[in-house]
Design a protein with these regions (language model features):
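Mature, solvent-exposed C-terminal subdomains and processed small-chain segments of exported/organellar
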Residues: 2-5, 21, 25-123, 133-225, ...
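Bacterial N-terminal signal peptides
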Residues: 10-21
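Alpha-helical, coiled-coil/dimerization segments enriched in small aliphatic residues
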Residues: 126-129
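Exposed beta-strand and adjacent loop surfaces of beta-rich binding modules
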Residues: 228
């Protein structure tokens, strides 16, 4: 499984702290006060001598526990010609380890009424379990065994079986799914050749076919070490006992070598690039992508608010205009998609019969120009912030969501509470001027306009006469296109 995580709050039990502004704070008129208090979730964080970071959060509302292990490695850590390894290794991690037979991990968690899975993005690979709290010790042992002893049981037969499964995933969800290759086309044309964000986490079929068991063993030795991992344990726990178990099962695992992080450059776009992708689809689709920012940027919160104003709900500007008022589109989406180092602001839409991608693009551009000129209304800001807060609180109901967020924030911000405090407060403090500013800064002429059209119908592309036609994005290079 692979996806990119949109950094909204996700978690479980919370405590809300109310703050009255001091006289000095009230005098700081240049800083907008947040409309909602920050969320406080109790946790304890510490680091073992081998570099493993541990985050514990006690919550006795249900007799369950979630365990999340995050490795700070994703598809951006791969190199051109060896793509798909991070996701493939996610599968390999479920093939057994030195003291755990193949299938036993799944059999145990499911047998006690729990569950487990993994996921991969550009930036991380995660593994999790949700189990009754009286099975926590065994779960920690299972995770420690595959962190420390996975290679003891990995052989070519197991590897080839998982490689075939991943190749089938690519066929099912990318190659043979409607619009399944759109973001592969976007990545290849938005970033320079060899850029770590230019390929999707699933990797290319050629690279998957060429991978060997020795390749993935090398990948494990590079990145699967305690000093590149964070473990979050959340729920019905005794913190003192949990610490003893973590020390028992993880403390003796060997620290890995220092991790070499890739040097990440900017997008290759200079001006507008237009691509027509002939695909096995029945209806065309328009996707407009602007280079934006990663999740460390101060502009991430206002861009997130802007995306919701444009396309989240029925009353969002683009959705309301195209789907409901003018009825020229069947669906619309707008989202700010940040990764650790780069980001993309995306708007896509599918036309109704008898309407065209050119019509959609024209109206989308008009709506964006309007918000760049006048900014959002006070009601829009209020509604979007309330919606984001409600969605966040709704997600704060499960141990697993909380564990995922605590692990994420520790791995990428060195603060398990970052999203619950800093990001939450910054988002609630976004002003109309902030939204107007980022709209003008990022939603300009430097963008990629992708028309996904049925095979043989390149005339259905938006402004087809200005667009370069592609049928195989991996072999037909468009890097030399001049905007």
């Amino acid at each position: 499984m692979f996806f990119s995580l949109r950094p909204r709050l996700c978690g479980i039990t919370l405590t809300i702290a109310w703050f009255a502004p001091s006289a000095d704070a009230a005098a700081q008129k240049a800083v907008a006060a947040p409309s909602a208090p920050p969320i406080r979730i109790p946790f304890e964080k510490y680091t073992l001598p081998n570099g493993l970071t541990v985050v514990l959060s006690e919550d006795h509302s249900t007799p369950t526990v979630a365990v999340q292990v995050l490795y700070h490695v994703g598809s951006k850590n791969e190199i051109a010609g060896h793509t798909g390894f991070a996701h493939m290794f996610e599968h390999v991690m479920f093939t057994g380890s030195g003291h755990v037979a193949y299938g036993l991990h799944d059999k145990f968690t499911e047998g006690v009424g729990g569950g487990n899975n993994g996921s991969t993005s550009f930036d991380w690979t995660k593994y999790y379990e949700t189990i009754p709290s009286n099975y926590l010790e065994t779960t920690l042992w299972l995770e420690s065994d595959r962190m420390g002893f996975l290679l003891d049981s990995l052989d070519d037969t197991k590897f080839r079986a998982q490689r075939d499964i991943v190749k089938n995933e690519r066929r099912q969800y990318t190659d043979n799914a409607p619009n399944g290759r759109d973001f592969e086309v976007i990545g290849l044309n938005m970033y320079p050749s060899g850029h770590p964000y230019s390929w999707p986490p699933i990797g290319s079929m050629d690279d998957l076919s060429g991978a060997t068991v020795e390749d993935v063993k090398h990948f494990f030795r590079q990145y699967y070490a305690p000093n590149n991992a964070t473990i979050a344990v959340v729920g019905d726990i005794d913190p003192a006992q949990t610490k003893r178990w973590i020390a028992k099962y993880f403390a003796d695992l060997q620290r890995g070598k220092p991790i070499a992080r890739p040097v990440i450059g900017p997008s290759a776009l200079r001006g507008e690039r237009r691509i027509t992708f002939e695909d096995r689809v029945q209806v065309p689709q328009l996707t407009i992508t602007w280079p934006s920012v990663g999740f460390h940027s101060a502009d991430q919160p206002p861009l997130d608010v802007l995306s919701d104003i444009l396309g989240l709900t029925r009353v969002a500007r683009i959705t309301k205009a195209l789907v409901y008022d003018n009825q020229i589109a069947t669906n619309v989406a707008a989202f700010q998609n940040p990764s650790e180092n780069v980001g993309q602001f995306v708007v896509n839409a599918t036309p109704r019969p008898e309407h065209t991608l050119t019509e959609l693009e024209t109206q989308i551009d008009s709506i964006i120009e309007h918000i760049k000129r006048d900014g959002p209304t006070a009601d829009e800001l209020k509604r979007v912030k309330a919606g984001q807060q409600r969605a966040s609180l709704e997600q704060l109901q499960a141990n697993l969501g909380k564990a995922a967020q605590l692990a994420n924030d520790q791995a990428f911000f060195n603060d398990p509470s970052y999203t619950f405090t800093v990001t939450f407060t910054k988002t609630q403090a976004v002003t109309a001027d902030d939204v107007k500013r980022v709209a003008n800064k990022y939603l300009g002429k430097t963008r990629l306009v992708l028309s996904n059209v049925p095979m043989g119908h390149v005339d259905q592309a938006s402004h087809a006469d200005k667009s370069v036609v592609v049928t195989d994005p991996l072999t037909e290079k468009t890097a030399e296109i001049k905007p």
